[in-house]
C-alpha cells in the first residue's frame, strides 16, 4: 500500500471516528494527518527540470502578453521548485502586468526571503509599493536594491518615477 493510500485510509478512519465521538484528540490527529498528506504530496511534486519547462512556457506566454496563462505556468513551476527565485520573480512581474499588486508584492517578498541579494526582487517589490501608493517603502526598497547593485538602471529609473 502506498503512503498516499495510507494517509487516505487514516483520514477516513479519523473522520468515521469523529462521527461516532467528537473527541478533540481525534480532531488533532486528523489535522496532523491531513497536513502530513499535503506535505507528502508537495514533496512528490518537486522536479527542477519540469520547473524549468514551466518557467520557459510562462516566459513564452508573457512575451505574447498572455498574462493569465503565464501566471498558471509560473505557479506550476513554483510547485515543482519552490526555492526558485527566478520563477517567483517572473510571476511577480506577470502580476504587475495584471495590476495585481498584492500578489506581485507577495512573490517579490518571497524572492527576497529566499535570496536577500536577488536585486530584481527589490525592483519588483519597490514597483509594487509604488503602485500601492506606499512611496516611502518603495524608495526604501529601491535604495536597498541599489546598495547591492549601484549601477542598476531599472531600479534607478523606478526610483526617479517614485520621487
Model-predicted regions and their roles:
Residues 1-163:
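Alpha-helical tetratricopeptide repeat
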Amino acid at each position: 500500500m502506498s503512503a498516499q493510500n495510507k494517509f487516505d485510509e487514516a483520514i477516513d478512519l479519523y473522520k468515521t471516528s469523529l462521527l461516532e465521538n467528537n473527541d478533540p484528540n481525534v480532531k488533532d490527529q486528523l489535522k496532523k494527518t491531513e497536513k502530513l498528506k499535503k506535505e507528502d504530496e508537495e514533496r512528490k511534486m518537486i522536479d527542477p527540470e519540469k520547473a524549468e519547462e514551466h518557467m520557459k512556457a510562462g516566459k513564452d506566454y508573457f512575451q505574447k502578453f498572455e498574462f493569465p496563462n503565464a501566471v498558471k505556468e509560473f505557479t506550476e513551476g513554483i510547485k515543482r521548485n519552490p526555492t526558485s527565485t527566478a520563477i517567483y520573480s517572473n510571476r511577480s512581474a506577470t502580476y504587475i502586468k495584471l495590476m495585481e499588486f498584492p500578489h506581485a508584492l507577495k512573490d517579490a517578498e518571497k524572492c527576497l526571503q529566499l535570496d536577500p541579494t536577488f536585486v530584481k526582487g527589490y525592483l519588483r517589490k519597490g514597483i509594487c509599493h509604488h503602485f500601492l501608493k506606499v512611496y516611502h517603502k518603495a524608495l526604501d526598497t529601491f535604495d536597498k536594491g541599489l546598495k547591492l547593485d549601484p549601477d542598476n538602471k531599472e531600479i534607478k529609473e523606478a526610483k526617479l518615477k517614485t520621487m
